[in-house]
């Protein structure tokens, strides 16, 4: 993906509020990941999700969802905020396709946590995106709904998160209703199918580690299982998968910083997810210039993490 001299650069788009947190002045720090991307010949743009759709249930009568519904409450099959944010990312790509300074065929999308969910939805619904980096997405993202571990469907359907999903999804978190009790086992699809919709494009499922704050609540193993279950679709479309068996019940997520970056489908668990020390690993994944995965920390980042 690196641009040839005189050609437009690839671009990464990220969901988030804007600039990242400043480095701690008491410790050595690499330049912010966005600065490293730009220095490496990439472009970078940040999407402000709240400018598209508010991150709360009260906002469902406003934003793009409210605009379509003319300020009325949404219908059961209408979007939640995740799909609305993905729609906004696609409209951003519409613009990038008109900008001759950008190679619009090499635009990726990335996000962490709820924005990791949104990045995965964006990639699944818009075939124009060439790359997705899905960070710590958990339930409603890359994690299998049916795996009874950590965050559950009932959390997504609760008061703090229900607006992320379509209204119809809420019935899968009900103990009592006119149609009876439903749970994750009643959902006709699961996360591996969402990941499969990204094939054969570059798809990275990433997590940090509990010791550094990426809680077990996110269920790293559950997302790895979903990626394993998505492998057949990547192979069907001529892409290289994780290189493990399709037995998602047997396969275990690799150890920290033992990353699976050799194919179009990738999984990795890092000490500092999506932070500056790891950005070169993501660049190598996108560029196809894979490197050994031994951990080596270095202040200038050229030898930092998964080098």
Task: Please describe what each predicted stretch is.
Residues 1-29, 127, 164-174, 182, ...:
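Alpha/beta-hydrolase-fold serine-hydrolase catalytic core, especially in secreted/extracellular enzymes
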Residues 76-84, 109-110, 120, 178-189, ...:
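Alpha-helix capping and helix-loop boundary segments enriched in small/acidic/polar residues
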Residues 1, 21, 90-186:
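Primarily recognizes the serine-hydrolase "nucleophile elbow" in alpha/beta-hydrolase
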Residues 49, 55-60, 121-122, 134-135, ...:
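Short, solvent-exposed loop/turn and secondary-structure capping segments
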Residues 37-40, 102, 113-114, 125, ...:
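Extracellular/periplasmic catalytic domains that process cell-envelope and extracellular macromolecules
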Residues 1-98, 138-148:
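Cap/lid segment of the alpha/beta-hydrolase catalytic domain
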Residues 47, 110-112, 132-137, 206-208, ...:
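Generic beta-strand/beta-sheet core signal
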